[in-house]
C-alpha cells in the first residue's frame, strides 16, 4: 500500500508530456512525375541541415497530406519540394535558383536562400494542421 501511494505521488509530480500531431497539406503540385519530399525540423540549429522526421510521397494528385505523429509540444519548421526526377535533391540552375517547386511552413520566403527557422516556425502545443503552397 505504501508503495502504491509513493508511486501515485511521484506520478502526479511528473506529468506526462502530451504527444501531438502535425498534419501538413502540400498544394500546387504541377505534374504527376516523381515524389514530394517533406522534412520536419525542431530547432534553428538543425533547420535545413538535419531533420528529425521526413516523408516521401509519390505524386498522385495536385495536393497531398502527410502527418507527423508523437510530437512533443514545441516549435517546428517544415520544408518540402517536388522531386520530379527522383534524385532526392532540390535541383537548381547555375545561379542557385531552384528548378523544382518548393515551399516552407507559414509559406515563408527567404532572400537568396531558405527562410529563417523563425519565419517558418510553427508552434505545436496541440494537434495542428498547416498548408504549404509550392512555388
Predicted regions, residues:
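Structural motif
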Residues: 26-33, 43
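A short, amphipathic beta-strand motif
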Residues: 20-29, 132
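A short tyrosine-centered beta-strand micro-motif
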Residues: 76-80
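Acidic, glycine-anchored loop motifs typical of Ca2+
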Residues: 86-90
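Surface-exposed loops/turns
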Residues: 31, 72-73, 124
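Bacterial Sec-dependent N-terminal signal peptides
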Residues: 1-21
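Extracellular beta-sheet/turn segments enriched in Thr/Pro/Gly and aliphatic residues
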Residues: 100-135
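A glycine-anchored, Pro-Gly-centered beta-turn/N-cap motif
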Residues: 62, 67, 72-75
Amino acid at each position: 500500500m505504501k508503495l502504491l501511494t509513493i508511486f501515485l505521488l511521484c506520478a502526479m509530480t511528473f506529468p506526462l508530456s502530451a504527444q501531438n500531431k502535425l498534419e501538413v497539406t502540400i498544394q500546387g503540385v504541377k505534374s504527376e512525375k516523381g515524389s514530394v519530399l517533406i522534412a520536419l525540423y525542431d530547432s534553428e540549429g538543425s533547420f535545413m541541415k538535419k531533420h528529425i522526421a521526413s516523408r516521401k510521397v509519390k505524386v498522385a494528385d495536385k495536393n497531398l497530406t502527410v502527418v507527423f505523429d508523437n510530437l512533443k509540444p514545441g516549435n517546428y519548421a517544415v520544408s518540402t519540394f517536388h522531386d520530379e526526377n527522383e534524385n532526392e535533391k532540390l535541383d537548381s540552375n547555375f545561379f542557385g535558383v531552384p528548378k523544382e517547386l518548393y515551399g516552407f511552413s507559414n509559406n515563408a520566403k527567404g532572400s537568396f536562400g531558405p527562410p529563417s527557422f523563425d519565419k517558418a516556425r510553427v508552434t505545436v502545443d496541440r494537434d495542428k494542421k498547416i498548408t504549404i503552397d509550392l512555388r
